[in-house]
């Protein structure tokens, strides 16, 4: 059994996770036209992978009744997409062109990033709504106790 702040804590982990996701999406959009990063490599699209906090596998939960009600979400990793090919543009006058005159641009699609940004923003808002609902229920419980 959790304490009275469990709902708020779970919502807070969701807000933190979505804020990080928004930061990564912003980095992707900011680097859409970059040909080189600080290390001299072409920027690659990044995405966030989430996992449940205090994850217990299904088989473990069958063997041991944990009573795990969930603790929220956390960032498992920030994934760099090396599968999607880079955009190759012929521009021999560009300072970053290779010996064949091609410039490589990040594998970032602005439309996809904007769609992901809307999704992350709405997920953040949903967590804020759940947080406020939990807070309001606690305030009502305090009023009842008066």
Describe every region a protein language model picked out.
Residues 1-146:
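Amphipathic alpha-helical polymerization modules
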């Amino acid at each position: 059994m959790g304490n009275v702040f469990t709902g708020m804590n779970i919502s807070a982990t969701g807000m933190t996770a979505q804020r990080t996701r928004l930061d990564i999406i912003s980095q992707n959009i900011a680097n859409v036209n970059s040909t080189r990063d600080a290390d001299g490599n072409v920027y690659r699209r990044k995405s966030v992978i989430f996992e449940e906090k205090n994850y217990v596998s299904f088989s473990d939960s069958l063997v041991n009744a944990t009573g795990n009600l969930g603790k929220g979400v956390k960032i498992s990793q920030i994934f760099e997409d090396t599968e999607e090919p880079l955009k190759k543009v012929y521009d021999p006058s560009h300072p970053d062109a290779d010996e064949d005159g091609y410039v490589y641009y990040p594998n970032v699609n602005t439309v996809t990033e904007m769609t992901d940004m809307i999704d992350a923003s709405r997920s953040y808002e949903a967590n804020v709504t759940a947080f406020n609902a939990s807070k309001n229920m606690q305030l009502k419980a305090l009023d009842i106790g008066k």
